[in-house]
Protein backbone atom coordinates (compact mmCIF):
# COMPACT_ATOMS: atom_id res chain seq x y z
CA UNK A 1 0.00 0.00 0.00
CA UNK A 2 1.39 3.39 -0.95
CA UNK A 3 1.34 6.13 1.69
CA UNK A 4 1.17 9.77 0.62
CA UNK A 5 1.87 12.69 2.95
CA UNK A 6 1.91 16.09 1.33
CA UNK A 7 1.97 19.80 2.13
CA UNK A 8 -1.51 21.23 2.41
CA UNK A 9 -2.78 23.88 0.00
CA UNK A 10 -3.25 27.37 1.37
CA UNK A 11 -6.47 27.79 -0.64
CA UNK A 12 -9.71 27.68 1.32
CA UNK A 13 -11.99 24.86 0.22
CA UNK A 14 -15.61 25.47 1.17
CA UNK A 15 -17.73 22.51 2.24
CA UNK A 16 -21.42 22.97 3.05
CA UNK A 17 -24.60 20.97 3.61
CA UNK A 18 -27.75 21.29 1.53
CA UNK A 19 -31.05 21.96 3.28
CA UNK A 20 -34.42 22.48 1.53
CA UNK A 21 -34.84 26.00 0.11
CA UNK A 22 -31.37 27.01 1.33
CA UNK A 23 -29.79 29.98 -0.41
CA UNK A 24 -26.16 29.51 -1.41
CA UNK A 25 -23.61 31.89 0.08
CA UNK A 26 -20.86 31.85 -2.51
CA UNK A 27 -19.18 28.88 -4.15
CA UNK A 28 -19.08 25.43 -2.52
CA UNK A 29 -16.39 23.07 -3.72
CA UNK A 30 -18.35 20.32 -1.97
CA UNK A 31 -22.03 20.15 -1.06
CA UNK A 32 -23.27 17.31 1.15
CA UNK A 33 -26.85 16.10 1.40
CA UNK A 34 -28.40 13.27 3.39
CA UNK A 35 -30.20 10.89 1.02
CA UNK A 36 -33.90 10.24 1.58
CA UNK A 37 -37.19 9.95 -0.29
CA UNK A 38 -37.97 13.51 0.82
CA UNK A 39 -35.28 15.13 -1.34
CA UNK A 40 -36.72 17.59 -3.86
CA UNK A 41 -34.75 16.97 -7.06
CA UNK A 42 -35.42 20.40 -8.53
CA UNK A 43 -34.47 22.24 -5.34
CA UNK A 44 -31.29 20.19 -4.91
CA UNK A 45 -30.30 20.92 -8.50
CA UNK A 46 -31.09 24.61 -7.96
CA UNK A 47 -28.81 24.76 -4.93
CA UNK A 48 -26.06 22.85 -6.69
CA UNK A 49 -26.04 25.32 -9.58
CA UNK A 50 -26.40 28.34 -7.32
CA UNK A 51 -23.49 27.20 -5.15
CA UNK A 52 -21.36 26.30 -8.21
CA UNK A 53 -20.73 22.94 -6.56
CA UNK A 54 -17.85 20.87 -7.94
CA UNK A 55 -18.77 17.71 -6.01
CA UNK A 56 -22.28 16.87 -4.86
CA UNK A 57 -21.84 14.15 -2.23
CA UNK A 58 -24.73 12.13 -0.85
CA UNK A 59 -24.58 10.61 2.62
CA UNK A 60 -26.49 7.33 2.79
CA UNK A 61 -27.38 5.95 6.22
CA UNK A 62 -29.42 2.94 5.03
CA UNK A 63 -29.02 0.11 2.53
CA UNK A 64 -31.98 1.46 0.55
CA UNK A 65 -31.51 2.91 -2.92
CA UNK A 66 -32.92 6.44 -3.20
CA UNK A 67 -33.52 8.04 -6.59
CA UNK A 68 -31.67 11.16 -5.44
CA UNK A 69 -28.43 9.13 -5.28
CA UNK A 70 -28.39 9.30 -9.06
CA UNK A 71 -27.72 13.04 -8.82
CA UNK A 72 -24.66 12.61 -6.62
CA UNK A 73 -21.06 12.51 -7.78
CA UNK A 74 -20.17 10.38 -4.75
CA UNK A 75 -22.10 8.43 -2.12
CA UNK A 76 -20.66 8.03 1.38
CA UNK A 77 -22.18 5.19 3.41
CA UNK A 78 -22.24 5.57 7.19
CA UNK A 79 -24.50 5.17 10.20
CA UNK A 80 -26.98 7.89 11.17
CA UNK A 81 -24.96 9.08 14.16
CA UNK A 82 -21.82 9.42 12.02
CA UNK A 83 -23.24 12.06 9.64
CA UNK A 84 -21.74 15.14 11.41
CA UNK A 85 -18.38 13.38 11.78
CA UNK A 86 -18.33 12.42 8.09
CA UNK A 87 -18.63 16.07 7.06
CA UNK A 88 -16.12 17.27 9.65
CA UNK A 89 -13.55 14.59 8.80
CA UNK A 90 -13.91 15.17 5.06
CA UNK A 91 -13.56 18.93 5.35
CA UNK A 92 -10.47 18.66 7.53
CA UNK A 93 -8.69 16.39 5.08
CA UNK A 94 -7.62 19.55 3.30
CA UNK A 95 -8.33 22.29 5.86
CA UNK A 96 -4.72 23.21 6.48
CA UNK A 97 -5.19 22.53 10.20
CA UNK A 98 -3.05 19.41 10.37
CA UNK A 99 0.60 18.42 10.50
CA UNK A 100 0.35 16.07 7.55
CA UNK A 101 -2.46 15.91 5.07
CA UNK A 102 -3.85 16.15 1.58
CA UNK A 103 -4.13 18.94 -0.90
CA UNK A 104 -7.52 19.64 -2.45
CA UNK A 105 -6.19 18.38 -5.79
CA UNK A 106 -5.34 15.06 -4.12
CA UNK A 107 -8.80 14.78 -2.59
CA UNK A 108 -10.35 15.38 -6.01
CA UNK A 109 -8.03 12.81 -7.56
CA UNK A 110 -8.95 10.24 -4.90
CA UNK A 111 -12.74 10.55 -5.28
CA UNK A 112 -13.18 11.44 -8.97
CA UNK A 113 -14.82 8.69 -11.00
CA UNK A 114 -15.31 6.48 -7.94
CA UNK A 115 -18.84 6.90 -6.69
CA UNK A 116 -19.05 4.65 -3.65
CA UNK A 117 -17.23 5.52 -0.42
CA UNK A 118 -17.47 3.77 2.94
CA UNK A 119 -16.86 5.68 6.18
CA UNK A 120 -15.52 3.99 9.30
CA UNK A 121 -14.29 5.46 12.55
CA UNK A 122 -13.06 4.56 16.01
CA UNK A 123 -12.84 6.97 18.92
CA UNK A 124 -11.73 6.70 22.54
CA UNK A 125 -10.54 8.81 25.43
CA UNK A 126 -8.16 8.09 28.28
CA UNK A 127 -4.72 6.57 28.73
CA UNK A 128 -5.01 3.86 26.04
CA UNK A 129 -7.16 5.88 23.66
CA UNK A 130 -5.09 5.16 20.53
CA UNK A 131 -5.24 1.39 21.05
CA UNK A 132 -8.97 1.41 21.80
CA UNK A 133 -9.79 3.70 18.86
CA UNK A 134 -7.86 1.38 16.52
CA UNK A 135 -9.63 -1.69 17.88
CA UNK A 136 -13.00 -0.07 17.20
CA UNK A 137 -12.50 0.81 13.56
CA UNK A 138 -10.49 -2.34 12.75
CA UNK A 139 -13.36 -4.52 14.01
CA UNK A 140 -15.63 -2.64 11.60
CA UNK A 141 -13.08 -2.89 8.82
CA UNK A 142 -12.91 -6.67 9.15
CA UNK A 143 -16.68 -6.99 8.67
CA UNK A 144 -16.92 -4.97 5.45
CA UNK A 145 -18.22 -6.51 2.24
CA UNK A 146 -18.18 -5.08 -1.28
CA UNK A 147 -18.14 -6.44 -4.81
CA UNK A 148 -15.54 -3.87 -5.80
CA UNK A 149 -11.88 -3.47 -4.82
CA UNK A 150 -10.67 -0.55 -2.73
CA UNK A 151 -8.89 1.99 -4.93
CA UNK A 152 -8.00 4.83 -2.56
CA UNK A 153 -8.06 5.39 1.20
CA UNK A 154 -8.24 8.73 3.03
CA UNK A 155 -7.57 8.67 6.77
CA UNK A 156 -8.06 11.55 9.17
CA UNK A 157 -6.65 11.27 12.69
CA UNK A 158 -7.97 13.65 15.36
CA UNK A 159 -5.98 13.69 18.61
CA UNK A 160 -5.09 15.70 21.69
CA UNK A 161 -1.78 17.54 21.82
CA UNK A 162 0.02 14.64 23.57
CA UNK A 163 -0.27 12.58 20.37
CA UNK A 164 3.15 11.98 18.79
CA UNK A 165 5.03 10.09 16.11
CA UNK A 166 4.92 6.82 18.07
CA UNK A 167 1.12 6.87 18.22
CA UNK A 168 0.86 7.88 14.59
CA UNK A 169 3.15 5.03 13.52
CA UNK A 170 1.09 2.58 15.59
CA UNK A 171 -2.12 3.57 13.78
CA UNK A 172 -0.48 3.35 10.36
CA UNK A 173 0.95 -0.11 11.14
CA UNK A 174 -2.44 -1.35 12.36
CA UNK A 175 -4.09 -0.12 9.17
CA UNK A 176 -1.43 -1.70 6.96
CA UNK A 177 -1.83 -4.98 8.85
CA UNK A 178 -5.62 -5.15 8.63
CA UNK A 179 -6.48 -3.39 5.37
CA UNK A 180 -5.67 -6.17 2.93
CA UNK A 181 -5.60 -4.31 -0.37
CA UNK A 182 -3.18 -4.05 -3.26
CA UNK A 183 -2.38 -1.02 -5.40
CA UNK A 184 -4.41 1.32 -3.18
CA UNK A 185 -3.14 4.84 -2.55
CA UNK A 186 -3.47 5.91 1.08
CA UNK A 187 -3.48 9.51 2.31
CA UNK A 188 -3.17 10.60 5.94
CA UNK A 189 -4.20 13.74 7.79
CA UNK A 190 -3.45 14.57 11.43
CA UNK A 191 -5.27 17.33 13.29
CA UNK A 192 -4.95 18.31 16.94
CA UNK A 193 -7.97 19.09 19.12
CA UNK A 194 -7.68 20.35 22.69
CA UNK A 195 -11.32 19.31 23.09
CA UNK A 196 -13.41 16.89 21.04
CA UNK A 197 -16.67 14.96 21.42
CA UNK A 198 -14.99 12.24 23.49
CA UNK A 199 -12.44 14.20 25.49
CA UNK A 200 -12.20 17.49 27.37
CA UNK A 201 -9.35 19.97 27.61
CA UNK A 202 -6.36 18.37 29.32
CA UNK A 203 -7.55 14.83 28.63
CA UNK A 204 -6.15 12.31 26.16
CA UNK A 205 -8.19 11.28 23.16
CA UNK A 206 -7.99 9.87 19.65
CA UNK A 207 -10.45 9.57 16.77
CA UNK A 208 -9.47 7.71 13.59
CA UNK A 209 -11.69 8.35 10.55
CA UNK A 210 -11.34 6.32 7.36
CA UNK A 211 -12.83 6.89 3.91
CA UNK A 212 -12.62 3.73 1.76
CA UNK A 213 -13.05 4.64 -1.90
CA UNK A 214 -14.15 1.77 -4.12
CA UNK A 215 -13.18 1.16 -7.72
CA UNK A 216 -16.82 0.80 -8.74
CA UNK A 217 -16.49 1.30 -12.48
CA UNK A 218 -20.19 0.66 -13.09
CA UNK A 219 -21.09 3.38 -10.56
CA UNK A 220 -24.32 1.58 -9.75
CA UNK A 221 -23.53 -0.33 -6.57
CA UNK A 222 -24.40 0.47 -3.02
CA UNK A 223 -22.11 -0.67 -0.23
CA UNK A 224 -23.71 -2.81 2.45
CA UNK A 225 -23.09 -0.78 5.56
CA UNK A 226 -22.47 -2.56 8.86
Which positions does each model-derived feature cover?
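Tubulin/FtsZ superfamily GTPase core signature
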Residues: 1-226
Amino acid sequence: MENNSSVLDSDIVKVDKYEPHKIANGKNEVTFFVASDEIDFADLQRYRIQAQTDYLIAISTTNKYYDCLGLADNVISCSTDEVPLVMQAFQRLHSGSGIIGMSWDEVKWAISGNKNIEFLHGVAGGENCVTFACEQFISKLQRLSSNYPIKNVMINMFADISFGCEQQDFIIKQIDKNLMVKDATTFYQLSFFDEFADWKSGERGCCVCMFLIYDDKSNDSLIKHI
